[in-house]
Amino acid sequence: MTVFYLTNAHPDIAWDWNRINTSDIHFPSSFAWGTATAAHQVEGNNSNNNWYQWEKAVDENGISRIHNNDSSAMAADHWNRYPEDILLMKDLGVSHYRFSIEWSRIEPQKGYYDLESLSHYRKMCLALINAGITPVVTLHHFTHPIWFEELGA
């Protein structure tokens, strides 16, 4: 909404925030302020999905796909630190948190469902609700299990 307004009011490629009057920008009281993440990018410690394989692969010249051969590895360790992250969200004043469920964690092998992972996501949702934050779940955010990749994805 704001970006649309600013783009129309100030079509320059770069906006000079010192010259832009934002006092007339208002959001309705029902506007949902939130944050968002993708499981593989924040949870960390997941070597069972297609993105992990892509991070480890090299191009046709043998060069790592990612500068310095970096990887998401532990990422932000949201898997273990979600209680702290939820406190930060609460302090930020958001009302919603959109996150993804990592398919390769809940179904690491075809037809096998990891109850501990399902329980983990349930606990995280309950912690969000207890903090007054509405969980908004994305069931598939780009990554999928290696077994699914091997089937042709």
Question: Where are the regions a protein language model picked out?
Answer:
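N-terminal carbohydrate-binding accessory modules
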Residues: F4-V94
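Substrate-binding cleft and catalytic face of glycoside hydrolase catalytic domains
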Residues: E43-N46, I86-A153
